Amino acid sequence: LPKHLSNVRIGDIVLLTSPYAGEDQPVVIEETARWLAEEMRIKMFGPGVPGISWETNMNAPEPDNSPTHRAMTGNNIPIVYPLVNIESLTSDRVFFMSLPLNVERMEGSWVRAIAIEDVL
């Protein structure tokens, strides 16, 4: 378990950011995604983009080509991305909400993402 995930509590919304981009950015692998989804039962996953990537296998057919993504969505955990400006947050714990557009027959939507510090 990466040290920066030791603060995750059961039922949290997990937002991740990193100052790195490209090949240097950290990758959320399937094992970590399954731990977050199945052991910690997180409510939502929000990777900062650029900065966080997830494991992909472009040679595999769908749905096996993105095991990290599938670990989340297969456990009914929404993924909110790309989150921008989360690197400006200064607290480890924030109140977070994601307000999607109400669009019929869509499985995804843009959101208004709001993080409030110093509430928890």
Name each model feature, range by range.
Residues 1-120:
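Active-/binding-site microenvironments in catalytic and ligand-binding cores
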